[in-house]
Amino acid sequence: MATPVKLQFAAPKRGMPPVHMADLDEETLKERVQELGLPKFRADQIRRQYYGRLQGDPMEMTDLPESKRAAVKEALFPELMQPMRNMDADDGETRKTLWRLHDGTMLESVLMRYPGRATLCISSQAGCGMACPFCATGQGGLDRNLSVGEMVEQARAAASTMQEEGGRLSNIVFMGMGEPLANYKRVVETIRKVSAPAPDGFGISQRNITVSTVGLAPAIRKLADEEMKVRLAVSLHTPDDELRDELVPVNNRWSVEEVLDAARYYADTSGRRVSIEYALIRDMNDQPWRADLLGKKLRGALGTKVHVNLIPLNPTPGSKWDASPKDRQDEFVRRVEAQGVPCTVRDTKGQEIAAACGQLAAEER
């Protein structure tokens, strides 16, 4: 019997970052602005600059009194994250950014450009406590949860980059470092902020936001009750409990059946189709019978409200596993679709710079 893997649902007790303007609601921001000796309406100007014009430096907010900009910066705009390194791949279409946070913690985010859209893969935690053995992030353990401000700042930085290029950040996927539903409250607040229209947010449609989870079943149901329109992606990786206990250790807490029941509740409540993420690993979870079982289970649990996203395993340092050969991958797709479940192979970006799914490790190399 395998040795139980220790999971980290609660982040270690570490100091959270200083409060940033993006952490505050409208009324609290007005109070803070008044404490600086400014009238309330200046709070609206700050919000329009930050969310509407993507300006993160009060010293450049020309509609604020010049004599007050330094005070606004000190009180409301602490430097939460500093870019340490950018790495580009896919002929410049993919950029991975390594960030150093205020306490020295490191994290990564990935901006991916596609024809007609730009997607940010955002981190919700520094590290991850779910301990999936094929994922570089999970093997590094959990440092701490990210604040709302730290997540919103990842989005603002990416949106600003796209604006400079004459484009627009259109999609956000919570598929970076961390288990989003283990940082539940802050992730939900971040979603509401980035999806609100300016000057309350960046105006990114909730339908263009995806939240990925390894399967925290109660949190999936709770997310459904938030009545948001974000897409749910469940990292399933195998349809049977025996193997999933090993590949996704949280399965020892919530079984495949419990996770799929929660996913069905989410689909019924939100009206959104659920995405099932499946990293295809050679001789581990790519057998024809597993493809058949996956299709049958998903069809039974979710009916037509499901889509399988097959991910060729991305290499990580020291891993004993590798991706399935293409002929086996194609056969897997065929068998899943034979059960009436749509199945596509993900267009993996950023593999050469360790920016693809499961590769983020925030190492300062």
UniProtKB/Swiss-Prot annotation:
A Pfam family reported for this protein in Swiss-Prot or TrEMBL: Radical_SAM
Disulfide pairings: C121-C357
Enzyme class at the top of the EC tree: transferase
Regions annotated as coiled coil: none
GO biological process: rRNA base methylation; tRNA methylation
Reactions performed catalytically: adenosine(2503) in 23S rRNA + 2 reduced [2Fe-2S]-[ferredoxin] + 2 S-adenosyl-L-methionine = 2-methyladenosine(2503) in 23S rRNA + 5'-deoxyadenosine + L-methionine + 2 oxidized [2Fe-2S]-[ferredoxin] + S-adenosyl-L-homocysteine; adenosine(37) in tRNA + 2 reduced [2Fe-2S]-[ferredoxin] + 2 S-adenosyl-L-methionine = 2-methyladenosine(37) in tRNA + 5'-deoxyadenosine + L-methionine + 2 oxidized [2Fe-2S]-[ferredoxin] + S-adenosyl-L-homocysteine
Keywords from the UniProt entry: 4Fe-4S, Cytoplasm, Disulfide bond, Iron, Iron-sulfur, Metal-binding, Methyltransferase, rRNA processing, S-adenosyl-L-methionine, Transferase, tRNA processing
Binding sites annotated in the UniProt record for S-adenosyl-L-methionine: G178, E179, S212, S235, L236, H237, N314
Record has Iron-sulfur as a keyword: yes
Record-given protein name: Probable dual-specificity RNA methyltransferase RlmN
Organism: Corynebacterium jeikeium (strain K411)
Annotated gene: rlmN
